[in-house]
């Protein structure tokens, strides 16, 4: 019996075209709440970047920064920054190979350099451009996640130098960088433990590589129609895209609305 549902944001709940949750999905979320199902966001975004979504619907909890910072009912349930050696590796790689990197702390968000690739990222997510700071600023600070602007052809510039980092990709132009112990599945566990819900009673929706650990961990994992084919082969169900209200399609299929 499904008692909790975790939703990725970009490309799942929110369309990359409209940057909004559709009326049909909002209606479905309200119907789920009326059934007593706990509803959570699970995203690579910082909590400060979720205001447009939170203004539309008040979720029961938040897995943010790809599982590194999780909150519910005003409490911090998981707070796992990168180890200092991982931050050093990241800073050194960004300086040596001069790639753009967004550093996400608990309170601060900053970027070392701005170019057309980073501007497109900001447009795609419809968020403000972070404050610009040199990469060295991150040294000795609590960094929970970074977004490194490296295509697949250039990702070796980071991966070859950073054994203490874990990376996931949900876009051709950038990688999410988190601690080795990180992931959305870890964040899911933090919220499920808090609400005393077994993981087999959880459902999860996502479309990117950074969602896969969560989809495989949940009792039911649903991939959006925009997900990669390899990801689709590993999950329990494949639904439509965000622009096709794929979340609603899957909820109807599983008899939840």
Where are these regions (language model features)?
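Short, structured coil segments at secondary-structure junctions
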Residues: 57-58, 66, 161-164, 217-218, ...
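Asp-based, Mg2+/Mn2+-dependent phosphohydrolase catalytic module
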Residues: 217, 222-257
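Asp-based phosphoryl-transfer active-site loop
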Residues: 3-17
């Amino acid at each position: 019996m499904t008692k909790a549902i975790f939703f990725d944001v970009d490309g799942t709940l929110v369309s990359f075209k409209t940057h909004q949750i559709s009326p049909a999905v909002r209606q479905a979320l309200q119907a789920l709440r009326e059934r007593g199902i706990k509803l959570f966001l699970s995203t690579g975004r910082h909590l400060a970047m979720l205001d447009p979504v939170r203004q539309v619907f008040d979720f029961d909890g938040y897995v943010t920064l790809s599982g590194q910072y999780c909150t519910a009912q005003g409490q911090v349930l998981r707070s796992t920054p990168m180890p200092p050696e991982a931050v050093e590796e990241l800073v050194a790689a960004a300086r040596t190979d001069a790639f753009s990197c967004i550093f996400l702390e608990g309170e601060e968000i900053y970027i070392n350099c701005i170019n057309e690739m980073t501007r497109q990222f900001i447009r795609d997510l419809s968020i403000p451009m972070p404050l610009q700071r040199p990469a060295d600023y991150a040294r000795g600070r609590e960094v929970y996640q970074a977004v490194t602007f490296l295509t697949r052809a250039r990702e070796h510039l980071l991966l070859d130098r950073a054994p203490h980092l874990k990376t996931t990709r949900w876009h051709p132009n950038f990688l999410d960088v988190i601690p080795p112990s990180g992931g959305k599945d870890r964040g899911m566990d933090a919220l499920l433990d808090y609400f005393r819900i077994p993981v087999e009673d959880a459902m999860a929706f996502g479309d990117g590589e950074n969602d896969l650990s969560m989809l495989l961990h949940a009792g039911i994992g649903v991939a959006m129609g925009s997900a990669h084919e390899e990801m689709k082969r590993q999950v329990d169900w494949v639904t439509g895209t965000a622009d096709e209200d794929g979340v609603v399609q899957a909820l109807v299929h599983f008899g939840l609305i």
